[in-house]
Amino acid sequence: MATNSTQETNKQLVQASFDHWGRGEGSPFDLLIPDVEWVIVGSSPLSKTYHSKQEFIDQVRIPFNARMAKPLVPTVHGIYADGDMVIVLFDLDAIGHDGLPYHNNYTWYLQMKDARVFKVIAFFDTQKFDEFWTRVRPKP
């Protein structure tokens, strides 16, 4: 169980990472350890457990971002900490290469140790995600 000061530090680190992401200066992915366990919950073909930062980035993040005409912009609605877990409620908005918007609601459960994220459980509307993934082809 994390101490109150560790809990608050973790929350502040995650808040700062989302602030940086919103300004295009970094992202929460910078907090991931190399062998992070990233779980996408749902029925999407991409819903599964990824066993490293690189696996997740190569199979999800890079091809997803390659479908965007402009970078994803997060809108954070709340960040909560309990023990070693930081929970983030946020939306992502962007425009795809087809000119149509992408919008989805996300909840990430970030489990932390030593100021780094070692496990993520991600919830979002996988149907919206899949529709976008299928509709928009990635650009190199």
Regions from the PLM with identified roles:
Residues T3-Q7, P45-K53, G99:
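Alpha-helix initiation/capping motif
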Residues G26, K53-Q54, Q127:
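Residues in well-ordered alpha-helical elements
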Residues V14, S27-L32, V36, F56, ...:
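Hydrophobic pocket/interface hotspot
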